[in-house]
Design a protein with these regions (language model features):
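Acidic, PIN/NYN-like endoribonuclease modules and their adjacent C-terminal/linker elements
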Residues: 1, 101, 105-135
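Short, well-structured N-terminal submotif of metal-dependent ribonuclease cores
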Residues: 1-37, 50-62, 126-127
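Histidine- and aromatic-rich ligand-binding microenvironments
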Residues: 3-6, 37-39, 93-95, 116, ...
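Alpha-helix/helix-capping structural signal
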Residues: 8-9, 40, 78, 118
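A general alpha-helix detector
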Residues: 9, 44-45, 64, 82
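Structured helix-beta-strand junction loops
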Residues: 30-34, 67-68, 89
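Active-site neighborhoods of divalent-metal-dependent phosphate/nucleic-acid chemistry enzymes
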Residues: 71-115
């Protein structure tokens, strides 16, 4: 099974003071699934890490991604088409979360690792009744 990983999870893993840190760390320690990070998540995580935790935290994240600790999923043209559909239907959902929905549908992934329960719980997917949100 594969899991798409959202920004909040990656940030929480790095920030020991984050409210989600412990739960996220415990989940990450136990998960055996393929972790897929949409390419659209990378700049968002990098920005948060650099602005809140500093350059060293951002560098550590980039190095772990470069080392293959997660799989990076590219954005495809069809994802952008679906992304626009999601953004039109759900105006509160922004670009990054919309691309996660589009990639989940394209890859037929039902599980999303996220701290953003509100957005992903409201989306009606084309391939599953509801996303399984972890941790």
């Amino acid at each position: 099974m594969a899991v798409l990983v959202d920004t909040g999870i990656l940030y929480a893993l790095a920030d020991e003071d984050d409210a989600w840190h412990e739960r996220t760390r415990d989940w990450a320690d136990d998960v055996n699934d393929l972790l897929i990070v949409p390419v659209t998540v990378l700049p968002e995580v990098s920005y948060l890490l650099h602005s809140r935790l500093g350059a060293a935290a951002e560098l550590a994240f980039v190095q772990s991604a470069a080392a293959g600790e997660v799989e990076i999923e590219p954005l495809r043209q069809q994802d952008l088409t679906r992304c626009a559909d999601v953004m039109r239907r759900y105006p509160d959902i922004g670009f990054v979360d919309s691309t996660i929905v589009a990639m989940a549908e394209r890859l037929t992934i039902e599980t999303i690792a996220t701290t953003d329960r509100r957005h992903f719980a409201m989306v009606k997917s084309r391939h599953t009744k509801a996303y399984q949100l972890v941790p």
